[in-house]
Each structure stands twice: as C-alpha cells, then as structure tokens.
Amino acid sequence: MDCRLGCGACCIAPSISSPIPGMPNGKPAGVRCVQLNEDNLCQLFGRPERPKVCHDFKACPVVCGKTNQQALANLTELERLT
C-alpha cells in the first residue's frame, strides 16, 4: 500500500523518541511534527535527515484504514495501547 498523500496521521498520532530537525527531543503523541507542512506532507521525505523510525514505517490497510481520519484514530489507539 502506498501512503495517501496529505494524510499525515503517522506524523501526528505516535510519539517519536528520535530527534527530528526542529524537535531535538522527538515529539509526544498527538503533537503534529514540525516537519509536516500545511498540506500534511513530510518536508524530510527522501532526505537523510528524516528519522529512521519514520523511514521504516510502511503504510498498510490495517493501520491506515480507508480514510485519513481512520488512520489517525487507528494510530492514536495503537499509541494508547503501547
């Protein structure tokens, strides 16, 4: 599955403990990554500064659902459970 352009759920819902340019301590769950632009696109996509955890995340129907809202809800619940 390819990511839905403009979704951004994986850049909002989960906590990320790795440093991110502009967020040296990572980001807490539910906080929008500073690298997510106004169109919900990662400004680091394809760049070496992108955290490994972000690079390694692969979209899948179970997590991402059929809509951006489903993806955000699913990832928020997974974060809550961990």
Swiss-Prot record:
InterPro entries to which the protein is assigned, alphabetical: Puta_zinc/iron-chelating_dom, UPF0153_domain
Family: Belongs to the UPF0153 family.
Protein name stated in the entry: UPF0153 protein VC_1057
Organism field: Vibrio cholerae serotype O1 (strain ATCC 39315 / El Tor Inaba N16961)
